[in-house]
Amino acid sequence: MSWSGLLHGLNTSLTCGPALVPRLWATCSMATLNQMHRLGPPKRPPRKLGPTEGRPQLKGVVLCTFTRKPKKPNSANRKCCRVRLSTGREAVCFIPGEGHTLQEHQIVLVEGGRTQDLPGVKLTVVRGKYDCGHVQKK
């Protein structure tokens, strides 16, 4: 190693860290075969569950109904409701179709499936189940 390389290492260690000695090798090394055998395969982090916590549908009680405005290129008032799920969690759900008669304290079935133009709305009310009626034909 030349003097210029040593001085460059000393210069970077002075500016980057508290050590006055030049760093000649990396402090973080790869695991040896013995360490990998002893520790086993690396643990994967658990999959993040959605608002239904891995279930296809959940029952919930309507707390209030309201309208939300969609994101930029779309313009409408989307009908939504705040629901207390059977897991104890509260969530905002989209009510599909035209017209609904949902009121406070009614029981609904919700399923996963976000509404693309409503930020934060990740659940959809199932029409025709419990207190939420079918969409009326014209």
Swiss-Prot record:
<dbReference type="InterPro" id="IPR005679">
    <property type="entry name" value="Ribosomal_uS12_bac"/>
</dbReference>
<dbReference type="InterPro" id="IPR006032">
    <property type="entry name" value="Ribosomal_uS12"/>
</dbReference>
<dbReference type="GO" id="GO:0005763">
    <property type="term" value="C:mitochondrial small ribosomal subunit"/>
</dbReference>
<keyword id="KW-0689">Ribosomal protein</keyword>
<dbReference type="Pfam" id="PF00164">
    <property type="entry name" value="Ribosom_S12_S23"/>
</dbReference>
<comment type="similarity">
    <text>Belongs to the universal ribosomal protein uS12 family.</text>
</comment>
<dbReference type="GO" id="GO:0005761">
    <property type="term" value="C:mitochondrial ribosome"/>
</dbReference>
<feature type="region of interest" description="Disordered">
    <location>
        <begin position="36"/>
        <end position="56"/>
    </location>
</feature>
<dbReference type="GO" id="GO:0005739">
    <property type="term" value="C:mitochondrion"/>
</dbReference>
<comment type="subunit">
    <text>Component of the mitochondrial small ribosomal subunit (mt-SSU). Mature mammalian 55S mitochondrial ribosomes consist of a small (28S) and a large (39S) subunit. The 28S small subunit contains a 12S ribosomal RNA (12S mt-rRNA) and 30 different proteins. The 39S large subunit contains a 16S rRNA (16S mt-rRNA), a copy of mitochondrial valine transfer RNA (mt-tRNA(Val)), which plays an integral structural role, and 52 different proteins.</text>
</comment>
<dbReference type="InterPro" id="IPR012340">
    <property type="entry name" value="NA-bd_OB-fold"/>
</dbReference>
<dbReference type="GO" id="GO:0003735">
    <property type="term" value="F:structural constituent of ribosome"/>
</dbReference>
<dbReference type="GO" id="GO:0032543">
    <property type="term" value="P:mitochondrial translation"/>
</dbReference>
<protein>
    <recommendedName>
        <fullName>Small ribosomal subunit protein uS12m</fullName>
    </recommendedName>
</protein>
<keyword id="KW-0809">Transit peptide</keyword>
<keyword id="KW-0687">Ribonucleoprotein</keyword>
<dbReference type="GO" id="GO:0005743">
    <property type="term" value="C:mitochondrial inner membrane"/>
</dbReference>
<feature type="transit peptide" description="Mitochondrion">
    <location>
        <begin position="1"/>
        <end position="29"/>
    </location>
</feature>
<dbReference type="GO" id="GO:0006412">
    <property type="term" value="P:translation"/>
</dbReference>
<dbReference type="GO" id="GO:0005840">
    <property type="term" value="C:ribosome"/>
</dbReference>
<keyword id="KW-0496">Mitochondrion</keyword>
<dbReference type="GO" id="GO:0003723">
    <property type="term" value="F:RNA binding"/>
</dbReference>
